[in-house]
């Protein structure tokens, strides 16, 4: 099985061309479910390791270039992934599946993507919705006031100062908020954000499905940009987000339209050994 690994701002993904349904046939031979296959594939140290797996599949609507099936590292399916969508678009372009201007299908809806140059990809996310301001969540680690928005997947955004951001235990606090009854039953992603002196925003994210802090989160960065703009913390509708990996993501808000732009990297491509299963 040919696999390709890309990373976008520190989020890494295993991408497989499954337009002929080959993957499901292979994992059936292995006696695995798709969820078990993904979990094993994403394991660090003993396997390939990744934040998620993307299967490129045939589009249901013939006017679109492809559809995807996105899986978190824990094997669960996800509606959307911002950095994953940028990596998937570059993969599709480099494999001649799609041109530079791409439309593809996700559970959250259609995503438009544009190949800006050899590495940079810009995507228009699905319209954001369900924005709620000033929600107080009480946890064993304290009470946290934040703002909820769905950018294809649910996100809770908490603004803090830079010192607090640096010293925060994102794993513990993020997990407590992610599983809080307020967000039941599906839970939420949790973002801690600090404005810098130059007007950009630093972000740390606890990702649902990965169940831990990640080096970046595209939809989380979008949620941060949306809230920063709507709450008046950013004077511009173009918001610079600095991820934990140190890379810059550019978020542009135009009414209910949100654009995510940043770099991607092709890490490797090769044949998967079934010995890991």
Swiss-Prot record:
Where does this protein hold substrate?
11, 72, 82-83, 189, 207-208, 218-219
Keyword Metal-binding (UniProt): no
**Primary site of residence:** cytoplasm
Q: Which reaction(s) are listed as its catalytic activity?
A: (2S,6S)-2,6-diaminopimelate = meso-2,6-diaminopimelate
Q: Name one GO cellular component term.
A: cytosol
| Record-annotated active site | 81, 217
Looking up PROSITE patterns in the UniProt record yields: DAP_EPIMERASE (PS01326)
The subcellular location is: Cytoplasm
Residues of the site described as Could be important to modulate the pK values of the two catalytic cysteine residues: 155, 207
In its UniProt record, which GO terms are filed under biological process?
lysine biosynthetic process via diaminopimelate
The reply on keyword Ligase is no
Q: Which keywords belong to this entry?
A: Amino-acid biosynthesis, Cytoplasm, Isomerase, Lysine biosynthesis
What pathway does the UniProt record associate with this protein? Amino-acid biosynthesis; L-lysine biosynthesis via DAP pathway; DL-2,6-diaminopimelate from LL-2,6-diaminopimelate: step 1/1
Cited SUPFAM superfamilies: Diaminopimelate epimerase-like
Xref: InterPro entries = DAP_epimerase_AS, DAP_epimerase_DapF
Q: What is its EC number?
A: 5.1.1.7
User: Signal peptide span per the entry?
Assistant: none
Top EC group: isomerase
GO molecular-function terms, A-Z:
diaminopimelate epimerase activity
Query: Member of which family?
Result: Belongs to the diaminopimelate epimerase family.
Subunit and partners? Homodimer.
What job does this protein perform? Catalyzes the stereoinversion of LL-2,6-diaminopimelate (L,L-DAP) to meso-diaminopimelate (meso-DAP), a precursor of L-lysine and an essential component of the bacterial peptidoglycan.
- Protein name as it appears in the record: Diaminopimelate epimerase
Species annotation? Hydrogenobaculum sp. (strain Y04AAS1)
Q: What is the lineage of its organism?
A: Bacteria, Pseudomonadati, Aquificota, Aquificia, Aquificales
- Its gene name is dapF
């Amino acid at each position: 099985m040919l696999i390709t690994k890309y990373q976008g701002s520190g989020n890494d993904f295993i991408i497989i061309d499954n337009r002929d349904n080959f993957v499901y046939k292979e994992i059936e031979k292995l006696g695995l479910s798709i969820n078990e296959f993904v979990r094993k594939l994403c394991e660090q140290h003993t396997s390939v390791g990744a934040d998620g797996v993307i299967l490129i599949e045939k589009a249901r609507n013939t006017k679109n270039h492809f559809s995807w099936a996105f899986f978190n590292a824990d094997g669960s399916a996800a509606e959307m992934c911002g950095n994953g969508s940028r990596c998937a678009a570059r993969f599709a372009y480099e494999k001649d599946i799609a041109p530079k201007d791409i439309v593809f299908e996700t559970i959250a809806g259609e995503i438009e993507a544009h190949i800006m140059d050899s590495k940079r990809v810009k995507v228009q996310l699905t319209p954001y919705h369900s924005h709620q301001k000033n929600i107080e969540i009480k946890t064993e680690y304290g009470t946290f006031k934040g703002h909820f928005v769905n950018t294809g997947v649910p996100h809770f955004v908490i603004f803090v100062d830079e010192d607090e951001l640096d010293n925060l235990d994102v794993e513990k606090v993020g997990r407590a908020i992610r599983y809080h009854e307020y967000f039941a039953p599906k839970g939420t992603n949790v973002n801690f954000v600090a404005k810098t002196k130059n007007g950009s925003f630093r972000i740390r994210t606890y990702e649902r499905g990965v169940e831990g802090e990640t080096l970046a989160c595209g939809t989380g960065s979008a949620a941060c940009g949306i809230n920063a703009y709507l709450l008046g913390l950013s004077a511009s509708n173009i918001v610079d987000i600095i991820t934990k990996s140190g890379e810059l993501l550019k978020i542009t808000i135009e009414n209910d339209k949100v654009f995510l732009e940043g770099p991607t990297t092709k890490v490797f491509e090769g044949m998967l050994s079934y010995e890991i299963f």
